[in-house]
């Protein structure tokens, strides 16, 4: 989902 992109950016 979109959370994957958001979290992926924050938890890079």
From Swiss-Prot:
Localisation per UniProt entry: Secreted; Target cell membrane
Organism superkingdom: Eukaryota
GO annotations of cellular component type: extracellular region; membrane; other organism cell membrane
TM spans (from-to): none
KW Membrane (keyword) present: yes
BP-aspect Gene Ontology terms: defense response to bacterium; defense response to fungus; innate immune response; killing of cells of another organism
Expressing tissues: Expressed by the venom gland.
Main location: secreted
Residues annotated with Arginine amide modification: 12
Effect of residue 9 to K: In HAL-1/10; loss of hemolytic activity and increase (~3-fold) in antibacterial activity against Pseudomonas aeruginosa
UniProt keyword annotations, A-Z: Amidation, Antibiotic, Antimicrobial, Fungicide, Immunity, Innate immunity, Membrane, Secreted, Target cell membrane, Target membrane
S-S pairs: none
Other notes: More than 20 analogs have been synthesized to study the effect on cationicity, hydrophobicity, alpha-helicity, amphipathicity, antibacterial, antifungal and hemolytic activities. A decrease of hemolytic activity is accompanied by undesirable decrease of antimicrobial potency.
Similarity field: Belongs to the lasioglossin-like family.
Role according to the record: Short linear cationic amphipathic alpha-helical antimicrobial peptide (AMP) with potent activity against both Gram-positive and Gram-negative bacteria, and moderate activity against the yeast C.albicans. Has been tested on B.subtilis (MIC=0.8 uM), S.aureus (MIC=7.7 uM), E.coli (MIC=3.8 uM), P.aeruginosa (MIC=45 uM), and the yeast C.albicans (MIC=6.2 uM). Has also noticeable hemolytic activity (LC(50)=102 uM on human erythrocytes, and 82 uM on rat cells), indicating it cannot be considered for therapeutic application.
Name of the protein described by the UniProt record: Halictine-1
Organism: Halictus sexcinctus (Six-banded furrow bee)
